[in-house]
Amino acid sequence: MSKTLRKKRHWLSKVQECVVSWGGPAGPDPELLHGGAERGEFPYLAGRLPTGAEGAPGPALLSGKAPAPGDVLLEVNGTPVSGLTHRDTLAVIRHFREPVRLKTVRPGKVINKDLRHYLSLQFQKGSIDHKLQQVIRDNLYLRTIPCTTRAPRDGEVPGVDYNFIPVEQFKALEESGALLESGTYDGNFYGTPKPPAEPSPFQPDPVDQVLFDNDFDTESQRKRTTSVSKMQRMDSSLPEDEEEEEKEAVNGSGGIENKEKHSDSSDWMKPVPSYNQTSSSMDFRNYMSRDETLEPLPKNWEMAYTDTGMIYFIDHNTKTTTWLDPRLCKKAKAPEDCEDGELPYGWEKIEDPQYGTYYVDHINQKTQFENPVLEAKRKKQLGQTDGGPSKSVPEKSLFTRDPSQLIGALIRTSLKKSTMGFGFTIIGGDRPDEFLQVKNVLKDGPAAQDGRIAPGDVIVDINGNCVLGHTHADVVQMFQLVPVNQYVNMTLCRGYPLPDDNEDPVVDIVTATPIINGPPVTKGDICLTSQELIAGTVVLDQNGKTGPMLVNGRLNGPSMDTNEQRISVASSGGSQPELVTIPLVKGPKGFGFAIADSPTGQKVKMILDSQWCQGLQKGDVIKEICHQNVQSLTHLQVVEVLKQFPIGAEVPLLILRGGPPSPTKTGKMKDKQESSGSLEALSDAIPQPMPFPPTAVRSGSPKLDPSEVYLKSKTMYEDKPPNTRDLDVFLRKQESGFGFRVLGGDGADQPIYIGAIIPLGAAEKDGRLRAADELMCIDGVPVKGKSHKQVLDLMTSAARNGQVLLTVRRKIFFGGEKQAEEDESQAVVTQNSSPRLNRAEFATQQSPEVYDVCLQRKENEGFGFVILTSKNKPPPGVIPHKIGRVIDGSPADQCGKLKVGDRISAVNGQSIVELSHDSIVQLIKDAGHVVTLTVVAEEEHRGPPSGTNSAKQSPAPQHRPLGPAQSSASSTDRGATEGEAGKEVSNSYRLSWPEHKHLAQPDAGSASGVGSRHSQAQNSGCFPVELERGPRGFGFSLRGGKEYNMGLFILRLAEDGPAVKDGRVHVGDQIVEINGEPTQGITHTRAIELIQAGGNKVLLLLRPGTGLIPDHSLAPSSLCPYVKPEQH
């Protein structure tokens, strides 16, 4: 799936290089180059270079793309010239023999001619822009001296280190524009004056310093610029994103361009070289110059840049990203072999003002205070090399994706898949730099009979496809897709030991065949640390709770022999599971049923037309289709299998029926990935959460693109908003279509809504679809973030099939007790072979009074009502728009249905709950002379229910207005009048987030671990906090993350930091969301990235704690020093 979007990229992607000859020893004409630091500008080209041959009179372009007039000159033969005067820039150019290599960039929002603008921008420390700012200052200080209003310190020489001037003189320089940058640090003013156009006779020639001073980048050289670098600038601002032309997005992420476009220019992504970074703490993400000693990146790897210019690497084989250069992995040394000042591969040194100096192991995701090199050498001297924190580094260096670099003997074999599989288990592949190895060879299996495969063999090649670096799930799926009685050709390498037993992450049996009260079912079963799980087999314990069934028949029992293959399922409740073969005939509109993802496989979600699927029941799990095993296939792959059969074909289905029902709807699991057996497959499916902990089982489906998973999880697979319910609506197409219109999708963040319901159309006859419902899925394809045209294309595709399955989200405005949302308990009525919800489904609740009001006005009058809009974003479920005034004698007054205080949820069938006030006013104006308002009566509209009828008895948040909602003519808050000549503006009411905090403790008694509570209770008692970055960050540090098997908690609060000043953040509070992304299951590093990605603001959703921080077993990380206060 691809879509067109406007990309924003770093200016490095616009850098151009060319080779120029000036046509004589005098060098370039001074008029060809303008700008210079004395004018407060970068050097830039004033004219276009003519193309010509070398040796011809005048300047000539010999190779590369000619820079355009106005392009900024960054480098000459690899030497940065930014910050030099015009005279010194020409001197550097003339110093080199012809031809010379120029590096230029087209001016943009971040880097342009204005040197003062670039120096005023804030960049992340360590980024290429931050580095370039330091280079500019170093070049400036060759000709100028920074000034300050503080007194000289011991050892400082006036006129050498700083010019020490009074405050009045400093402000005079600032007002005259003589300072390139200015600001305050530690209560004193600092500034960098413009250098003079002509140097004094006592100043040395800067060319030698710029070109050959190896100590130019040392700490001693920069000591005097520390205050200037860290000062609070007067005109500081964040950089704007550079906009690029429209490009095709890949997998919806828009992140990667087609490399074929750059086949002639392999260096197109390389940054400007020689902004030298010394052998300091940032070795693991060094800015790479044209280092010819480095070989090309491995196959399907790509080097890319963050928005701030940081280099990272994309592995398209595993669809993962890393800071670590894969080419340096082969050159990695053991820690004890590293020299002083050198760090092992994958390590980073952090100098933190609060925690001091510590070291981060990015490979093993650990932190420690001791230098890993000194630690390894110390332990080597003491003879205690075991257990060192970098023990895995030598092992990592053995990994390679190049088969020619493998150590050991290559073994080639061909195995025939039996009903028992291939007869061996595999281990590894949990990380991109980990081999997949044979764990066990099962007795009497094809591998044992072949005799050539042994434990420890590394899987190199499967049917001609190199799998070095592939994930565990990818390789398992490749084996599972081989039909029974077919051969697979394999290449293995013998010579690598198996990892220790305590490091075995996951073992997959590609072969074992469980017996479930019937014939064998071939499936790649999954086990964790020698405990095998039959995917989807769920039993009940004595308390009636669900849990995974181990192959030895015990729940969560001790480990078992991995060679165990045959089991029988013992159930303490529910019907006995059975395998049933059902013959089906494909009708003109498909097989007549819809399927959905479930923990046990693809299950029958809905019977649409029983005449074509007689014998099939809702809840049946599909195991085989026409004798083809489909247990390991994704949702869309099963749909494709069903689609390939022609109309009238007889297709036998092997299904699993009975046994204890697995949870079908929980707080964390929604069967949204639905599709009819004959629907069009349009996007990738997302695996649904399992009813037992996700760490206990690995998915057999290939790993999805992280950006795709993230985008989709932000649409409908995250916790759905409270006070909403999701509905599945199946419609059959009539001659006039499906009978409804679609609104929205005008922008990337604009939701899609159901518009008008066409009278006598399919939607109205069905009765379940309503105007203003938010459209979530079309035939299982999420539509959030899609454009209006893309949604129409999906509907057109559905129309060709004659039917559509819609998933819509509807807001609920409570008037009493909460309505039960379990879809499975709702009655289903079938009319004309179409499922239909019972119209009495709301009979048990006090429904709020929601009605439509149609107003008609004359040419010379308005509608006669005033809409007030909440100034602050209210809590979910609260409509922010209400009637503030009804004008006497107006159409609104004459209709008698509008009252002051009534909430307006839709205009002309379009939901306005999420719209701004100005958008609503414009919507009413565009309606012309007739407008239809969807009204929620004032006395019926209440906040979210508390669970009881008394707010005082409930610990749930209560929303109460903090200020009056009366009108005020003097206010400039949002509000408008419709139907009057003048514009009357009113104070909009405000709703507060609850002041008191309620801690919702997780239910530890449920074996499933997921879905034991209703989705609305997940964030119960949580409160949002928005913090603005201060001079040293957001003022808090974190503890926890997935790698520590714990959630994320507030560890410390910095004194006088933004978090302390806010007053709501306390030590021990749990972080539930960061900038809208749930923190469940994310790593410590990912949490830091989310905080940094927010720029100058961060939005946290916190759950109040007890003041105590949960401990974990990793002592070196107990202080979580990786989280730097200055960064968040």
Swiss-Prot record:
Keyword Ribosomal protein: no
Compositional bias per record (Polar residues), positions renumbered to this chain: 946-956, 965-974
Protein name: Membrane-associated guanylate kinase, WW and PDZ domain-containing protein 3
Broad class of the protein's primary localization: membrane
Function statement: Acts as a scaffolding protein at cell-cell junctions, thereby regulating various cellular and signaling processes.
Subcellular location: Cell membrane; Cell junction, Tight junction
Domain WW residue range list: 295-328, 341-374
Biased segments, Pro residues type: 193-204
Gene Ontology terms, MF aspect: ATP binding
UniProt keyword annotations, A-Z: ATP-binding, Cell junction, Cell membrane, Membrane, Nucleotide-binding, Repeat, Tight junction
Family: Belongs to the MAGUK family.
